[in-house]
């Protein structure tokens, strides 16, 4: 089983006084359901899990009065084998986008405050807009991402103490011994080729077989395409899929990594496709890095909405859009040309995205110098040399 940092975040939520319902957000197949189930197993006497895709008729639990007592009574009749006890039972509503009344009910669970309720689902940014009454102010949020490089190292057997020792070299500005550096670069190239989707990482941990990983990556990509076909409006289905499948070409096949609509379709224009990018963004299928015209606070004040780079939400999905040989070149360190620059730009951007940073990039029109990833932290960034 892969160790995930999100477990600690859920523990913090549980220990919060007067906690609200927890909404676990994130892209498809990033491990949301697995993490919640594992957490419940270790921290509660009972887990009551309702997956609204699997249990279609379970929506009836939320069809009447949405008082907590009524909902709990309906759950007890539906699941008589389950003990539903305050503080001892975790109520987990999965694929909640399939039941809009369950979304509305979160307000009443939070006000009542006797039961611990966690919800999750795919494309919540799309479906929450259809809820009859969204529970603003009554939910806490946890965003889950694919596995990051540190979590990948844990999966490969590298302990936290070993990683701490490595960080010690960096913090003291000491040269890392070549044997360690070389092995870490091998791990990093493996991680780039595999990506952070838990199923792909677990397959590599178990088999060390990139061909098996490739099968999973392509299956995951098909799942994303299915979601576009299933959830997008009739007007957006084809356009959103075209935009999504163009991302590898946008990032790896040309020197300029700006998202260009002409790469989606010959003669393509923003007027036709920008709404599809917005849909993919709300659906947690892409994240964007916008051009900023100046590197100063607040970066968003200098951002251009019409000039951006678009990335898949995990490296696994980018790998699935390209031939298997790309993984071979990455692992063997034989990448050249635009693909090499694009892959490593993407890898750094992916790492920052998984830390929760809003990303931008900068280009000085006078010197033509570029910074591929710009974000704001408590650190002061020198700008006089740009």
Positions of predicted regions on the chain:
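Hydrophobic anchor at the beta1->P-loop junction of P-loop NTPases
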Residues: 24
